Amino acid sequence: LNRDRFLNKKQRDAAHAMLEAGADILDIGGESTRPGATTITPEEEIARVIPVVRELAKAAPVSIDTRNAATMRAALEAGAEVINDISALRHDVEALAVVRGSHAPVILMHMPGDDPATMQSLATYDDVAVQVTDFLAERIAACEAAGIPRGRIAVDPGIGFGKTIDHNLALID
């Protein structure tokens, strides 16, 4: 979502078209995570996503795509049911506590570093599949140690996030 802070007709129609096409959940994010993207403050992110989460949560389950604990908390209160964090709960020290204190499932994604602006410069692996697997196993262990049950944890290898085309192909092979 951009800084407009509301769903325009095109976005609303796209969300409903996705649901009609069979989408089970809508993933809403207010901060671009493309390589080299500029970060925004949690306050700006909250202003962008919360009205949209409130609206779309009436029609379908919503996932909040954020690295920020304050946004996670606000989105859950607004009706989001899942937390999707590209930093695997590493970016914000309060994120583990927010997830633990909720009943929401969490998606942990692999990305080298915790900043989309620099992730592509860190795309160096000896064995991408082993290193991504090890990273995700460590993050699962950190979640479990923080009191988040394994049954609430899903993982995402982060295709396209801090990886070359060859890395991406190795992960899906």
Task: Give residue ranges: language-model regions.
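Conserved anion-binding
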Residues: L1-D4, S32-G36, A59, M72, ...
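Catalytic domains of carbohydrate-active enzymes, especially glycoside hydrolases
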Residues: D13-G29
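Active-site beta->alpha loop and helix N-cap motifs at the rims of alpha/beta catalytic domains
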Residues: G36-L76, A80-V82
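Glycine-rich, proline-tolerant flexible connector loops at the mouths of alpha/beta enzymes
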Residues: D24-P51, I159-I165
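Alpha-helical segments flanking ligand/cofactor-binding loops in enzyme cores
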Residues: H16, A47-I50, R54, R73, ...
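Conserved, mostly hydrophobic/aromatic
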Residues: M18, G22, D65, A75, ...
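Short, acidic/polar
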Residues: K9-M18, R67-A70, F135, R139
